[in-house]
Design a protein with these regions (language model features):
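Active-site histidine-anchored catalytic micro-motif
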Residues: 18, 22-120, 125-126
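Flexible, glycine-rich active-site loops centered on histidine and acidic residues
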Residues: 15
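Conformational coupling and interaction surfaces
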Residues: 94-98, 104-106, 110-228
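Single conserved hydrophobic/aromatic residue that forms the stacking wall/gate
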Residues: 1-10
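A short linear-motif detector with a strong N-terminal bias
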Residues: 2, 29-31, 56-59, 88-90, ...
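Short hydrophobic/aromatic-rich motifs at helix boundaries and adjacent loops
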Residues: 11, 31-32, 71-72, 135-140
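Short glycine/serine- and small hydrophobic-enriched flexible loop segments
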Residues: 1, 62-65, 168
Length: 228
């Protein structure tokens, strides 16, 4: 997926341009293919497992097609994906809208945060100084990645897109959710990759509506500093 993203962007650079550290600075790829790893892990699990997706849903969708029996082993999926209250195509969905449609239509409960809420989780000057002033190996690497991201996107301060989904695993009350059904558009050109949300109290999908942005940022900083 790293290489695929770069190849896609060479042809048509999207507004949400992905960037990453050089390949040599990233952890080595696991020898087992991601799809096989998912299937084996889920089939061998003694209890239900919670999945987290912060990129394209290609591997999850492929695993569901290859081994439908894993559905009963997934209790729910947390995802940074989509945009539910404004008509924007979000990067993780547009990388593979068909995969996203398969996952959202699978019957698995999904708790998703989209651009509607992640764009509110923005660092301020003090947060950035704190990050850049730290000297631990982890935070040095995060500083390097943050500078690369800001340079690529043109933003002065980083936005906690994917980290918000991770924080939600730790504290669900950080985001006000709305329950309903998500439909991923895979027809036509203009709407391809849009995530359409229909409110329904009985729905198995929950999407973020409001976020306690300051608490999210503080939690992220706290965890990174304590770990790093």
């Amino acid at each position: 997926l790293r290489r695929r993203q770069r190849q896609m962007c060479i042809r048509d650079r999207p507004p949400q341009f992905p960037c990453s550290l050089p390949e040599k600075d990233l952890p080595p790829l696991h020898p087992t293919h991601g799809v096989n790893f998912l299937i084996e892990t889920l089939l061998n699990a003694q209890e239900e497992i919670v999945l987290l997706t912060i990129g394209a849903m290609t591997n999850v969708a492929t695993a569901l097609i290859m081994e439908p029996g894993i559905i009963r082993k997934i209790s729910r999926i947390y995802a940074m994906a989509g945009c539910y209250f404004s008509p924007q195509v979000e990067w993780n969905i547009c990388c593979d809208p068909i995969a996203a449609r398969i996952v959202f239509d699978s019957g698995i409960p999904i708790i998703a945060v989209g651009l509607d809420v992640t764009l509110k989780c923005v660092f301020n000057e003090q947060d950035l100084r704190k990050l850049y002033g730290a000297g631990t190996p982890l935070l040095c690497k995060l500083t390097e990645a943050t500078r690369l991201w800001c340079g690529s996107t043109g933003r002065k301060f980083p936005v906690l897109h994917d980290p918000l989904a991770v924080c939600l695993l730790l504290r669900e009350n950080l985001v006000e959710m709305e329950r309903g059904r998500v439909f991923v558009e895979i027809e036509g050109e203009k709407g391809y990759g849009l995530t359409l949300f229909e409110k329904n109290e009985q729905g198995i999908h929950q999407v973020g509506k409001e976020v306690k942005a300051r608490e999210v940022i503080d939690l992220w900083i706290e965890r990174c500093f304590n770990y790093g």
